[in-house]
């Protein structure tokens, strides 16, 4: 029985756990290695008054699953952020962490990677088969088509009622969820993508994939990373007292930073390091 989305695409989501909090991310395979991509606020607490960013904690774990749908044990990477440098975009809500360098390919086309200092795992010793978004699956901002179908990958942790026993929860919060929507529009001034798809707490940093129908074949492309939802703001004014009560709700639309912005950022950071 065929699946609507390829197995390797379903293994892209990464659960990020840091300082008692969690968010979403994904691995992106650049030319020199694999990078963890997420939203900046997943890893950093923002001090708006002083315009400062502070890491929620000095250690973080990245959990993901292999492309084998029968594999139930996640691949867990532990990152010491005192040894691993986190790069943050100067404009967008984006953070990247280089986790490994590519050593060689297996006969099946999988990269055998070697972790950089500060990244460890208990599962497979020093080598790890990563499942990241390849460069040839990344769609440029200029090529993104409004109205096309999209999928949001992530770990929304604000859904459901969190019970003390995992068995009592409706959701398994250690497994990713998909959400289907469309590309609602593009903001050319900000160079961002607007999606018609609800974004919840925990989805931040998650990957968005576009599905394109070519003849009778479905093709999937990485669009970018979820950074926030667009609020619906309603002001209610008292006619008697003149007071205003503001209600802010989730509009069902979200903002995505395109993947080519992330690739440009990675390239600039590489050039600055040489």
Residue ranges of predicted features:
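C-terminal cap/linker of serine protease catalytic domains
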Residues: 2, 219-274
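Catalytic histidine site
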Residues: 4-78, 96, 100-102, 182-186, ...
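Short, charged beta-turn/beta-strand-edge "cap" motif at the junction between a beta-strand
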Residues: 43, 156-159, 214-215, 230
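Hydrophobic alpha-helical segments and helix pairs
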Residues: 77-132
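Short glycine/Trp-rich loop-beta-loop segment that forms part of the substrate-binding cleft
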Residues: 119-168
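A mid-sequence, solvent-exposed acidic-amphipathic segment
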Residues: 156-202
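Catalytic nucleophile loop of clan PA
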Residues: 197-226
């Amino acid at each position: 029985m065929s699946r609507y989305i390829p197995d390797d695409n379903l293994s892209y989501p990464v659960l990020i756990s840091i300082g008692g909090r969690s968010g979403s991310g994904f691995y992106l395979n650049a030319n020199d290695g694999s990078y963890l991509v997420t939203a900046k606020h997943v890893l950093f607490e923002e001090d708006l008054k002083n315009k400062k960013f502070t890491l929620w904690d000095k250690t973080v774990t990245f959990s993901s699953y292999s492309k084998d749908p029968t594999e139930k044990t996640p691949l867990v990477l532990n990152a010491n952020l005192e040894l691993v440098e986190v790069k943050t975009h100067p404009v967008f809500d984006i953070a990247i962490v280089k986790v490994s360098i590519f050593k060689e390919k297996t006969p099946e086309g999988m990269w055998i990677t070697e972790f950089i200092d500060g990244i460890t795992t208990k599962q497979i010793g020093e080598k790890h088969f990563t499942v990241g978004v390849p460069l040839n699956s990344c769609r440029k901002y200029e090529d993104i088509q409004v109205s096309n179908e999209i999928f949001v990958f992530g770990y929304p942790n604000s859904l459901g009622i969190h019970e003390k026993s995992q068995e009592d929860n409706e959701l398994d919060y250690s497994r990713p969820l998909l959400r289907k929507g469309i590309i609602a529009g593009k903001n050319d001034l900000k160079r961002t993508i607007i999606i018609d798809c609800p974004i919840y707490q925990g989805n931040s940093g998650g990957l968005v994939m576009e599905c394109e129908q070519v003849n009778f074949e479905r093709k999937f492309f990485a669009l970018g990373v979820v950074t926030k939802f667009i609020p619906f703001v309603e002001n209610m004014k008292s006619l008697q007292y003149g007071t205003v009560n503001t209600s802010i709700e989730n509009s069902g639309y979200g903002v995505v930073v395109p993947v080519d912005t992330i690739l440009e950022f990675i390239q600039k950071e590489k050039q600055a390091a040489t």
